[in-house]
């Protein structure tokens, strides 16, 4: 099993990704072999947030030239993670018909991005 630090490589900061932070969407560069489930678990473990949705995109490496030599840049994967910005308590019925409320404390933003909601 891989560590969350091995799956999430770094945040992907662009003008578009900064605008999406207000909607609770954060963008990361992730390991090429990672799956959506692994990305979700890694973000929840690293940042203590509740992940609602993960969208991934694969990018092929471009061929670049240096003088007469040609070589490919490495392929990479981008993940857009939507977190729960308004966590609601979960109510369910326990044995005996009692209603139990589960108030898990999750963060509503990722402060490491430097943008507060």
From Swiss-Prot:
Molecular function (GO) terms for this protein are: rRNA binding; structural constituent of ribosome
What are the record's GO terms for cellular component?
ribonucleoprotein complex; ribosome
Query: What does the UniProt keyword field contain?
Result: Ribonucleoprotein, Ribosomal protein, RNA-binding, rRNA-binding
GO term, biological process aspect, one: translation
> What domain of life does the native source organism fall in?
Bacteria
Q: Which SUPFAM superfamilies match?
A: Ribosomal proteins S24e, L23 and L15e (SSF54189)
Family designation: Belongs to the universal ribosomal protein uL23 family.
In UniProt terms, what function does this protein have? Answer: One of the early assembly proteins it binds 23S rRNA. One of the proteins that surrounds the polypeptide exit tunnel on the outside of the ribosome. Forms the main docking site for trigger factor binding to the ribosome.
What's the subunit arrangement here?
A: Part of the 50S ribosomal subunit. Contacts protein L29, and trigger factor when it is bound to the ribosome.
PANTHER family in the cross-refs: 60S RIBOSOMAL PROTEIN L23A (PTHR11620)
Q: What is this protein called?
A: Large ribosomal subunit protein uL23
Q: Which gene encodes it?
A: rplW
């Amino acid at each position: 099993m891989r560590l969350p630090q091995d799956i999430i490589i770094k945040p992907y900061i662009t003008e578009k990704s900064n605008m999406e932070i207000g909607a609770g969407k954060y963008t990361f560069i992730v390991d090429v072999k990672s799956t959506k489930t692994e990305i979700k678990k890694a973000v929840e473990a690293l940042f203590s947030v509740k992940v609602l949705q993960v969208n991934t995109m694969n990018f092929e490496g471009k061929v670049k030239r240096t003088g007469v030599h040609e070589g490919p840049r490495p392929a990479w994967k981008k993940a857009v993670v939507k977190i729960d910005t308004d966590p609601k308590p979960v109510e369910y019925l326990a044995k005996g018909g009692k209603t139990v409320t589960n108030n898990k404390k999750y963060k509503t933003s990722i402060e490491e991005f430097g943008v507060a909601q």
